[in-house]
UniProtKB/Swiss-Prot annotation:
This is FYVE, RhoGEF and PH domain-containing protein 2. Zn(2+) 1 binds at residues 464, 467, 489, 492. The modification Phosphoserine is found at residues 10, 39, 47, 654. The keyword Lipid biosynthesis does not apply. It is found in: Cytoplasm; Nucleus; Early endosome; Early endosome membrane. Zn(2+) 2 binds at residues 481, 484, 510, 513.
């Protein structure tokens, strides 16, 4: 019967906590612990008004540093550290060895730390909070709303612990001989610990406001400093006291975990204590989630500020996945340019640094939607660690500073792509239902005009990729087809077609893409002419060649070295060596039938040099490495003897 009465009193106390919330105009001391009806053991020995002492000049000069978000997030990693728990309890020291059970010693430690914690809450709510509110109303030197933002919902937390949990815990310890259990008490506490999430989320903002107004308002600083110098504050700063509620839930979890470990296997409180531990763990996770959400929003805000707070990118629901500098490979310039990428869960922002670092740090040049984006590694000897990002809006060739950085960027992009595709598939399955179409969609073979192409770099070609006429700076300049990315001359790109990836705006396209996109018949006189013997595309050679690479042709007179050329032995014409001015040229400037040639390796004492000789004709080539020279010599010897790689005993020398 007595136990039932105790439970009824506990519920009444709990209801009173939330029915008697203080209003802004309420008297400052109307809910102090001294007014509560619990036993003398619960009374807190606080000096009545120590903060009324005259201001201390030295204390006014002290600096207050805001608690960083990094330090706040580190609290999540300390849940299992017993040493951390003990270091946070300077006023609690283990007493002499007694004969009481170990689980009771843990409960007594929980009670002692709870008493000290409620004293800190009383100091925060009834002293700091009320004194600052009174000063704000009297002097109008700082807004009352600022004070309320700094202390958040500390009043609810204080009343809950002072009027409900501490009295319940005290009664249970006093009656331990008759009721050796606390699991049921903790279970009553656990659901209300979620109120800490609001306090934790507001903590960093509160610390910033406190630091700001300590510098900005002299009356604000004087009130805080007077209280900090008092005996009740133990010479600790307000920020130190404000951190206690953030640390309290991890301490509950540590103490309760130790209590469960000390309980005997047949203890009547074991089941309730384990259930209470699970509930405390859930509350700790809830608090950690609040910290993570606060960090996410703060990180988003920092990025948005550096990008100039543009309306079309600012969205609090976004998730920042990765950001950092990269090098942009230009299709016109030989040296890559410094750029900055910001990857969100739904878009990739391609940014350029601003010349004047006033306000925004970067300017968003292109936004690429993750939906439909593709990423792959590029095999480019001139630009190592390079990768391609192809989106509907634009295709970018990028270079990282190391292979690890390149892999990290590619993995981050691919993870974002996979997540978007997974959500899309889930949505389609929900719309179609179990009776929906189960056939796998056929991949779209032709994406011409639907997504931005990869542009061929200017220096990779020396002639128009459509008409094979050589470029020059005056009469035949380079242009890019916006549909296929080929480098073409003005005559071959004098057409306009609407491209879907560019919001159906007319763009310069080549004749071939114009015909495909519009369906119009080729204009008279524009039909493709018959291919000549040298018109074998070099762009297809790396995938369809026995061997291909840059070779330097050494002249006969005075060993004069000519510019290096792109040389290919095609699979479909394995007895001929084609020499191109650039890798993407559609027409070779020289072809050498290899049948009957004699191959001499290293004629000039250089292991990278080899020579072709036949009937007074002589060609001397220099490879970029000894290994590459060996591959060329093997392939040419095979071709010179009339053998082709289709035989079963022949070896393919291509990579």
């Amino acid at each position: 019967m007595e136990r039932a009465c105790e439970k009824q009193d506990s519920v009444c106390n709990l209801v009173a906590v939330f029915e008697n919330n203080r209003t802004p105009g309420e008297a400052p001391g109307s809910h102090s612990l001294e007014d509560q009806p619990h036993s003398p053991e619960h009374q807190l020995s606080l000096s009545p008004e120590p903060w009324e002492a005259p201001p201390v000049k030295e204390a006014l000069k002290s600096e207050f540093r805001p608690v960083s978000r990094t330090y706040l997030s580190s609290l999540k990693n300390k849940l299992s550290s017993g040493a951390w728990r003990r270091s946070c309890q300077p006023g609690v020291s283990p007493g002499p060895e007694t004969q009481e059970p170990e689980e009771k010693r843990v409960v007594r430690e929980l009670l002692e730390t709870e008493q000290a914690y409620v004293a800190r809450l009383h100091l925060l709510d009834q002293v700091f909070f009320q004194e600052l509110l009174r000063e704000a109303g009297r002097s109008k030197a700082f807004p009352e709303d600022v004070v309320k933002l700094i202390f958040s919902n500390i009043s609810s937390i204080y009343r809950f612990h002072a009027q409900f949990f501490l009295p319940e815990l005290q009664r249970r310890v006093d009656d331990w001989a008759a009721t050796p259990r606390i699991g049921d008490v903790i279970q009553k506490l656990a659901p209300f610990l979620k109120m800490y999430s609001e306090y934790v989320k507001n903590f960093e903002r509160a610390a910033e406001l406190l630091a700001t107004w300590m510098d900005k308002s002299q009356p604000f600083q004087e009130v805080v400093t007077r209280i900090q110098c008092s005996e009740a504050s133990s010479s600790l700063t307000l920020q130190h006291h404000m951190l206690e509620p953030v640390q309290r839930i991890p301490r509950y979890e540590l103490l309760l975990k130790e209590y469960v470990q000390k309980l005997p296997a047949q203890a009547p409180d074991l089941e309730d204590a384990q259930r209470a531990l699970d509930m405390i763990f859930s509350a700790a996770q809830h608090s950690n989630a609040a910290i993570a959400e606060m960090e996410r929003l703060q990180g988003l805000w920092d990025v948005y500020q550096r990008l100039g707070l543009e309306d079309d990118i600012v969205d609090p629901s976004n998730t920042l996945l990765r950001e950092g500098p990269v090098l942009k490979i230009s299709f016109r310039r030989s040296d890559p340019m410094e750029r900055y990428l910001v990857l969100f869960n739904n878009m990739l922002l391609y940014c350029v640094p601003r010349v004047l670092q006033v306000g925004a740090q970067f300017q968003v040049r292109t936004r690429i939607d993750v939906a439909g984006m593709k990423v792959r590694e590029l095999t480019d000897a001139e630009f190592p660690h390079s990768f391609l990002v192809s989106g509907k809006q634009r295709t970018l060739e990028l270079q990282a500073r190391s292979r690890d950085e390149m892999v990290s960027w590619m993995q981050a992009c691919q993870a974002a792509i996979d997540q978007v595709e997974k959500r899309s598939e889930t949505f389609k399955a929900a719309v179609q239902g179990p009776q929906g179409d189960t056939q796998e969609p056929k991949p779209q073979v032709e994406e011409l005009g639907l997504r931005a192409p990869q542009w061929v770099r200017d220096k990779m070609v020396t002639m128009c990729m459509r008409c094979q006429e050589p470029f020059n700076a005056l009469t035949r300049r380079r242009h890019h087809c916006r549909a296929c990315g080929y480098v073409v001359c003005a005559k071959c790109s004098d057409y306009r077609a609407e491209l879907k990836y560019d919001s159906n705006r007319p763009n310069r396209v080549c004749l071939t893409c114009y015909t495909f996109l519009t369906g119009n018949v080729l204009p008279q006189g524009k039909e493709d002419k018959r291919r000549g013997i040298l018109e074998k595309e070099a762009s297809a050679a790396p995938e369809q060649s026995l061997v291909c690479s840059f070779l330097q042709l050494i002249g006969d007179k005075c060993s004069r070295s000519l510019p290096r050329s792109w040389c290919v032995i095609p699979r479909d014409d394995p007895l001929v060596l084609y020499v191109y001015a650039a890798p993407q040229d559609t027409k070779a400037h020289t072809s050498i039938p290899l049948l009957g040639y004699q191959v001499i390796s290293g004629p000039q004492g250089d292991p990278r040099v080899f020579q072709l000789q036949q009937s007074g004709q002589q060609y001397t080539f220099k490879a970029e490495s000894v290994e590459l020279q060996g591959r060329w010599v093997t392939a040419i010897k095979r071709a010179a003897s009339g053998r082709t790689p289709e035989g079963p005993d022949e070896e393919d020398v291509s990579d």
